[in-house]
Amino acid sequence: MGNKLRKCTQCNIYTLKDNCPECGESSGNPLPARFSPLDTYGKYRRISKKREMEHA
C-alpha cells in the first residue's frame, strides 16, 4: 500500500507503475517541488530557467 500516483512525462497519463503503460516512457512524481523561503538552490534554479527561456 505504499504506491504513489505517478505521471508519464511523454503522454501525461497518470499511473501507479514506474513506466507508462501506453508509451513505455518513464513516469515521475506529478507534484511540484516543495517551496521553502530558505531555498539554498533557488538562485541556480532561476538562472537555469532564465537560460531555458532565452533558448526557446
Curated annotation (Swiss-Prot):
| Any single Pfam family the record assigns to this protein | Nop10p
- What GO molecular function annotations does the UniProt record carry, in alphabetical order? snoRNA binding
> Which keywords does this chain's UniProt record carry?
Ribonucleoprotein, Ribosome biogenesis, rRNA processing
GO annotation, biological process: pseudouridine synthesis; rRNA processing
> Is rRNA processing given among the entry's keywords?
yes
**What does UniProt give as GO cellular component?**
ribonucleoprotein complex
Q: What does this protein do?
A: Involved in ribosome biogenesis; more specifically in 18S rRNA pseudouridylation and in cleavage of pre-rRNA.
Q: Which family does it belong to?
A: Belongs to the NOP10 family.
Q: Can you say what this protein is called?
A: Ribosome biogenesis protein Nop10
Q: Which organism is the protein's source?
A: Methanococcoides burtonii (strain DSM 6242 / NBRC 107633 / OCM 468 / ACE-M)
